UniProtKB/Swiss-Prot annotation:
SUPFAM superfamilies: Eukaryotic type KH-domain (KH-domain type I) (SSF54791), Nucleic acid-binding proteins (SSF50249), Polynucleotide phosphorylase/guanosine pentaphosphate synthase (PNPase/GPSI), domain 3 (SSF46915), Ribonuclease PH domain 2-like (SSF55666), Ribosomal protein S5 domain 2-like (SSF54211). Mg(2+) binds at residues 489, 495. It is found in: Cytoplasm. The keyword GTP-binding does not apply. It comes from Streptococcus suis (strain 05ZYH33). The gene is pnp. Its EC number is 2.7.7.8. This is Polyribonucleotide nucleotidyltransferase. NCBIfam families: polynuc_phos, PRK11824.1. PROSITE patterns: KH_TYPE_1, S1. Residues 699-739 are annotated as: Disordered. Belongs to the polyribonucleotide nucleotidyltransferase family. HAMAP family: PNPase.
Amino acid sequence: MSKQVFETVFAGKKLVVETGQVAKQANGAVVVRYGDSTVLTAAVMSKKMATGDFFPLQVNYEEKMYAAGKFPGGWMKREGRPSTDATLTARLIDRPIRPMFAEGFRNEVQVINTVLSYDPDASAPMAAMFGSSLALAISDIPFNGPIAGVQVGYVNGELIINPDQAQQEASLLELTVAGNKDAINMVESGAKELSEEVMLEALLKGHAAIQELLDFQNQIVAAVGKEKADVELLQVDPELQAEIVAAYNDDLKKAVQVEEKLAREDATNAVRETVIATYEEKYAEHEEFDRIMRDVHEILELMEHTEVRRLITEDKVRPDGRRVDEIRPLDAEVDFLPNVHGSGLFTRGQTQALSVLTLAPMGETQIIDGLDDEYKKRFLHHYNFPQYSVGSTGRYGAPGRREIGHGALGERALEQVLPSLEDFPYAIRLVAEVLESNGSSSQASITAGTLALMAGGVPIKAPVAGIAMGLISDGTNYTVLTDIQGLEDHFGDMDFKVAGTRDGITALQMDIKIDGITPQILEEALAQAKKARFEILDVIEATIPEVRPDLAPTAPKIDTIKIDVDKIKIVIGKGGETIDKIIAETGVKIDIDEDGLVAIFSPDRAAIERTKEIIAGLVREAKVDEVFQAKVVRLEKFGAFVNLFDKTDALVHVSEMAWTRVNKPEDLVEVGDVVDVKVIKIDDKGRIDASMKALLPKPEGYVEPEKRERSEKPRRHKEHKEKKDNNFGEFKFHKVDKK
């Protein structure tokens, strides 16, 4: 295939697709250029069906640092494991693509997205999502797409498609929505307490914008698309299925309706084990034993799937006996742990999360160095899901994609209500430990996080609660479920997580297993979620009515002082000499950010106050009409130099010493004297003139004497000059004669 180029304009930026030139051995490959972001997407499929009971789809998103003209960090100077952002982007692409493959498709599929050049104003993740769909669509892989996705922002009351970097920074909404022609099938969002109405409008606007991208993909597929491969789908033997259903369906129905999770699992497992043992014995010598037993396992899964859905849609009964809009029993507790900076335990039915708060100086913030400019991440929310939470053994090690994704969702939900850095100069870390799980553990971790923050004295704007909504749909009729449990998530069609305050939504996440959902379902789910969210907020507020006024005794003491940006170098000093001297003197820890916010950390409040005084003195500037008690540090023929504060001197001319004529400064003052002076002038070079007589009453009948010419002699004495090499920015040390 020769190179072909397709071009359009989307959201004000050029969108160019190239095919037939690179990665030609892949089943499908495209180069997508959006603005100046360039992504290569290659899709490949295995020749044979994989073993296992799931579809082995793998989506990768690789950030190459050369794309932004940067060297990779670390000693190796080479890209290693994906960053958290890259992992989240891969999940973002996987989720809308996965439902678009046929039921029973088991061939392994890999979709690899490589960012080759990066433009911060043109979303590389959205280019990768577009490229992933298109690479699959033009390939021979049996993909029932296309899909597409867009980002939606909300700036000054206006919804914006694919906002640029400046618009993103000003936006109250960070929404990614994906779908096909008929419906939305993936949502990921953080928001600053926006209403359900605004969120729904944003979702619909995003879906409308997607249509343009879908049309563009269809044009390309029509021009270069391959014929789809004829692959084997996993299908069970219908006669075997009918036989097992007839013999064991009644037993499975009874097992599924056991309300308690562990007892229900025991009951369903007993039925499964009976069926499996029966057919293992029956077909032990059969030449297709492996295929038959694979079918038996698949049939049992289908039977349970069918019965759970039938109970909900026909009998209007959920496996645990709840109504469709009913939340499981709730319980909340704070101060579960001693010595930590804050803790909250939240239980919803058989799902339980413990959240633990840790506060630290800003020096502990995480430095993020990716394709964007390096920045410091102040708030971290980590989610851990040990296997004991579901009563089983399993992998134990570093967090996987699911744990990273759930942690990020909680982070988005809670960061919207955190106090500003100026009001609360701490790095904040929340760790959610899932202790029990029967569905919706990510939302339990959000609610537990709110409890921990409030108990720890972090002045959040409002409590945040989370709830997971589900859906059972047969294509014509549907039922929206509130607070889905594990079985409803596993056999249902939707997992729609909504977190927020009483004033609005702070985070959304939606994954579905069908082609898409309609605006009507979205609206109904958002309304039910709001009602449920308020019920959970009632429990939070009954447990801890307001944020505690003080931090935990074990939490670090931190205070701040704001300085001008151009004064930062004065506080730091040459080679860090000044700040090191302050730290050595007071025993504190000091962090200074690029905006001039100085955070001072110490367990000793007196040390913090002393440090603030020192820094305030270093950056202090005298003002005209300000009055000081100043020490005389040097005498000249034309006047006296006095120290106003720290390293700041002023000249008191002999004519400003008294209302009467003064011939020599030493007639009135000596070095070491302390005198009251008033600042009367600061010239454009920063030189300060002060007056003693301005603070004295003017004699009656006073006549202004003729002024003498001001000497042009340098105002700094010899010792100042000798210290020139030890300056801190524009700041000079001087010695004070103590004789």
